[in-house]
C-alpha cells in the first residue's frame, strides 16, 4: 500500500504528446494535492511555463516538432527556470537516453509506463524542502 504523499499546492507541468499519459499523470498528481498544468508538446509547454511557473516539470522525450531534449534544454537555459527540476519521461530505458537527458540538464529519468508511486516519489525527491 502506497503511503499517502501530501504534495498540496505543488505545481507540476506534464509535457507529453500522449493524451493517455497526460491524463494518468494528472490523476495521480491531483490525488496527491498537486496543481497540474498539461502541455501536448514542447512549444505548448514553452508557451505555458512562464504563466504557470511550475515547481517541477515532467517531459516526454519522443514528441513531434520539439523533442524532450530540446524542450528541457530551452527550459534550463531560461534564467527563471534554470533551477526548476525537469524529469524526462520515456518508454525507452537506454543508457544513451539517460546520458543525453543529463547533458541537456534533466534531473531524473522515469520510464513509462510509470506507477503512481514512482511519479510521486520523483516529485517529492526533487522538490525544494518545504518548511511546514
Language-model region placement:
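Charged docking surfaces used in two-component/phosphorelay signaling
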Residues: 23-31
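Short hydrophobic/Thr-rich beta-strand motif most characteristic of the beta2 strand and flanking loop
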Residues: 33-40, 48
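Active-site beta3 strand of CheY-like receiver
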Residues: 52-58
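Receiver (REC) domain active-site loop signature in two-component systems and cognate sites
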Residues: 63
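C-terminal output helix
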Residues: 114-123
Amino acid at each position: 500500500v502506497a503511503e499517502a504523499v501530501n504534495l498540496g499546492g505543488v505545481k507540476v507541468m506534464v509535457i507529453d504528446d500522449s493524451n493517455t499519459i497526460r491524463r494518468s499523470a494528472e490523476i495521480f498528481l491531483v490525488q496527491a494535492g498537486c496543481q497540474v498544468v498539461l502541455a501536448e508538446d514542447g512549444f505548448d509547454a514553452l508557451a505555458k511555463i512562464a504563466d504557470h511557473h511550475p515547481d517541477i516539470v515532467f517531459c516526454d522525450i519522443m514528441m513531434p516538432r520539439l523533442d524532450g531534449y530540446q524542450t528541457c534544454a530551452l527550459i534550463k537555459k531560461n534564467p527563471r527556470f534554470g533551477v526548476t527540476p525537469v524529469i524526462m519521461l520515456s518508454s525507452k530505458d537506454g543508457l544513451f537516453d539517460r546520458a543525453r537527458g543529463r547533458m541537456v540538464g534533466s534531473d531524473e529519468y522515469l520510464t513509462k509506463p510509470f506507477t503512481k508511486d514512482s511519479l510521486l516519489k520523483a516529485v517529492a525527491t526533487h522538490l525544494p524542502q518545504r518548511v511546514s
